[in-house]
A protein has these predicted regions:
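Short, charged juxtamembrane terminal tails flanking transmembrane helices
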Residues: 1-6, 149-158
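Individual transmembrane alpha-helices with interfacial aromatic-anchor signatures
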Residues: 124-138
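Hydrophobic alpha-helical transmembrane segments of integral membrane proteins
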Residues: 86-123
C-alpha cells in the first residue's frame, strides 16, 4: 500500500523544485524574463537546481556566492518533502525521489526542446554536470534526513 504522505511529499517537492532556486538566486530572473518559450523557462528553472558544482567547490575553483543558493534550495526541497512524508526512512526516500524525478524531467524536456545535452556530458562540462548532480542529491538527502527526524516517526496503521 502506498502512503499518501510519501506521494504528497514527493509531489510537493517536485512542485517546489521549479521555484526554489529561482527565489534563492535572483540572477536567473533576467534569463527567465528574456525567454519567450515556456519550455525553455521550465528547463532553466529545473536546471538551476543542478548548477552548483560540488567537485569544483572542494578543489577551490568556485566561490561561496554560487554555493549557497543551489545547495540551500536542494536542502529546502529535501526538508519539505521529508517533513511531509514523515519519518526518517520515508523522508530519505521522498527527497531522493524528488531529485531523481527532477533530473529526469530536466533531461526529457531538454531533449524535447532541442537542447545540446552532449555539451553537458563531455569535456570540461562533465565535471561540472556530475558535481551539480552530486550536490543536488547531497543537499536533498541532508534535507530529507533533517525533515524526517524533525517530523517524528511514521505511524503504521493496520
Amino acid at each position: 500500500m502506498v502512503s499518501y504522505r510519501l506521494v504528497l511529499g514527493v509531489l510537493v517537492g517536485i512542485i517546489f523544485s521549479f521555484f526554489t532556486v529561482y527565489f534563492f538566486n535572483m540572477e536567473y530572473i533576467e534569463i527567465i524574463n528574456v525567454q519567450t518559450d515556456i519550455l525553455k523557462v521550465i528547463i532553466i528553472q529545473l536546471g538551476a537546481n543542478f548548477k552548483f558544482d560540488l567537485i569544483a567547490f572542494f578543489t577551490g575553483t568556485l566561490n561561496i556566492v554560487d554555493f549557497a543558493p543551489q545547495l540551500l534550495a536542494s536542502i529546502f526541497i529535501g526538508f519539505l518533502s521529508g517533513t511531509i512524508s514523515k519519518g526518517l526512512k520515508r523522508g530519505l526516500i521522498a527527497s531522493s525521489l524528488v531529485i531523481i524525478i527532477d533530473f529526469l524531467i530536466w533531461m526529457l524536456l531538454s531533449v524535447i526542446s532541442g537542447e545540446d545535452l552532449m555539451a553537458l556530458f563531455q569535456g570540461a562540462q562533465l565535471s561540472g554536470t556530475i558535481g551539480g548532480i552530486l550536490s543536488a542529491i547531497l543537499g536533498a538527502i541532508i534535507g530529507g534526513l533533517l525533515g524526517g527526524i524533525i517530523s517524528g516517526p511514521y505511524e503504521e496503521v493496520y
